[in-house]
UniProtKB/Swiss-Prot annotation:
This is Sirohydrochlorin cobaltochelatase CbiKC. The keyword Transport does not apply. Co(2+) binds at H166, H228. The lineage of its organism: Bacteria, Pseudomonadati, Thermodesulfobacteriota, Desulfovibrionia, Desulfovibrionales. Its EC number is 4.99.1.3, 4.99.1.4. Catalyzes the insertion of Co(2+) into sirohydrochlorin as part of the anaerobic pathway to cobalamin biosynthesis. To a lesser extent, is also able to insert Fe(2+) into sirohydrochlorin, yielding siroheme. The keyword Manganese does not apply. It is found in: Cytoplasm. It comes from Nitratidesulfovibrio vulgaris (strain ATCC 29579 / DSM 644 / CCUG 34227 / NCIMB 8303 / VKM B-1760 / Hildenborough) (Desulfovibrio vulgaris).
Length: 282
């Protein structure tokens, strides 16, 4: 190629530059206000940075109550929309948002709506969403395998395992039932219930009594350990799951570890994020 001569019109033409691409990742969790939960999210953050070196990672909490509670403790956190707006202001063009929710319920729907809003009106060039833990049949099978792989090692033959999820009136509540059905095919003494869904401890207690079990390992089906796990599940209040199980004559052993503390579950979320990051280039 012959360089333009001095004084030629070619030398005055503006250079054509492709728009700069700036990628980022936003991790969206329900929220956490205790050390264990914060440690769990920090370890998840490290796994994400290992898989996507050089890609900035931000956080958002989807729970309004959790954000207010943290604000009262002078800990600033962002909603999904606020975090996305900050990333847009910082000139990010491609953003992958990963949900750390268990099911695609109402909060996940709000997250998707926030991302969609930032796609419109001269927003991001591309914005994608990574699915929650139980988003499809493949996820169900992998989650069932992870759940069974992480059952307590010290469990005895006469002991059941009961997992407590959050629960919702959203149609995605059926995700818990689908997971429970897969697990029961392998181990009929593993039960999955929720605090406020269609299958609660009221439904599980008679099954435990009829099954002849003597003890129960109680585990949260929640991303991180927070008040639901420490109080609603394993607390001393008469209405906690632990208290009710003990009142029915069953010995109860709580295990306070969230699903984001187990590699088998974390790998599913990371694979969803990988798909979301790859889709940014489509």
């Amino acid at each position: 190629m012959v360089p333009p001569r001095w004084g030629s019109l070619d030398s005055l033409k503006p250079q054509q530059h492709l728009p700069m691409t700036k990628k980022g990742i936003l991790l969206a969790a329900f929220g956490s206000g205790n050390r264990q939960g914060e440690s769990t999210l920090r370890l998840f953050d490290e796994r994400v940075r290992e898989r996507f070196p050089g890609v900035p990672v931000r956080w958002a909490f989807t729970s309004v109550i959790m954000r207010r509670r943290l604000a009262a403790a002078r800990k600033k956190t962002d909603s999904v929309l606020k975090a996305l707006q900050k990333m847009w202001f910082e000139k990010y063009t491609h953003v992958a948002v990963q949900s750390l929710h268990i099911i695609p319920g109402a909060e996940y729907g709000d997250l998707v709506a926030d991302v969609e809003a930032m796609r419109r009106d001269d927003g991001f060039t591309a914005a994608t969403v990574g699915a929650p833990l139980l988003a499809g049949s493949g996820d169900m099978e992998r989650s069932a395998a992870a759940l069974l792989a992480h059952l307590p090692a010290g469990r005895k033959p006469d002991e059941a395992v009961v997992f407590m999820g959050h629960g919702t009136r959203h149609p995605a509540e059926s995700s818990y039932e689908a997971l429970a059905a897969l697990v029961r095919r392998v181990d009929p003494h593993v039960h999955i219930g929720t605090m406020g869904g269609s299958r609660t401890l009221d439904h599980i207690l008679p099954e435990l009594q009829q099954g002849g079990v003597k003890g129960v390992w109680l585990m949260p089906l929640l991303s991180v350990v927070g008040r639901h796990a420490t109080e609603d599940m394993a607390g001393t209040d008469p209405e906690s799951w632990k208290s009710r199980l003990e009142a029915s004559g069953l010995r109860c052993i709580p295990v306070l570890r969230g699903t984001a503390e187990y590699e088998g579950f974390v790998d599913i979320w990371l694979d969803h994020l990988t798909a979301a990051v790859s889709a940014l280039d489509d």
